[in-house]
Amino acid sequence: FNMNCVGHINHGLWTHPRDNSVDYNTLEYWTDLAKTLERGLFDGLFIADIIGVYDVYQRSVDLTLRESIQLPVNDPLLLVSAMAAATKHLGFGITSNLSYEPPYLFARRMSTLDHLTRGRIGWNIVTGYLDSGAKAMGLDGLTAHDQRYERAEDYLELVYKLWEGSWEDGAVRRDKAARVFADPAKVHRIRHQGPYYQLDGYHLCEPSIQRTP
C-alpha cells in the first residue's frame, strides 16, 4: 500500500536516515519497489491518491507543506507502465477519483493500461473527500455524499458500456491479406443518457485482456 508522494501515511518518517521515500519522483524508486515486491511473492501493489490538499488545520496548508503530508503528490497511473515492464506477475491497483475524470477518456486510459500490463491493472473507485480538491476543480465545495455516489453509479454504467459493449469478441481480425483490421459489424456505437453523463460514440480501444479492470 503506497502513494505517489513522500511518506504516504507515515508522516514524518521521510526524515529518517534510512527512508528513501523522498525519491518518489524518480522512476527507479517505483521500478525497484515493484521488483522487490515481486521477489517477495506479493500479489499486487495498491496505490492511493487524493485530489486536493489538507488545509483545515489552522486554516492553512503550511504544516502540510513543511511535513510533506501527501503533498506534493504525483499521478499514480503514470507509474504503472514502467512497473509492469519491470515485472511479470505483480498486479497494480490504482486509485482514481471519478468525480473529476471524464469517463470517456478514463475508459481509454484504463484499457490502454490493461493492454500494456497484460491484464494486471485494477481500479480503486473513489469520489473524493476534500473541499480543497473540489474548489481546485472549479466547484464551490465538495458535493454532498449521496449525490457523489449517484454520480458514481452513472459514471460506472457508462464506462462499463464502453468496455463491455462497444467491441464484440472477435471484432479484431488483423487480417492483412483482406485489409481488415476490425469487423465494422462487431463494433458498436454506445449511447448513454444518464442523470450526470451523456455519451454518443465508440470506445477508442479494442478489447483488453480483462475488458473491465
PLM features per residue range, with description:
Residues F1-P213:
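N-terminal glycine-rich cofactor-binding segment that shapes the pocket for flavin-like pterin cofactors
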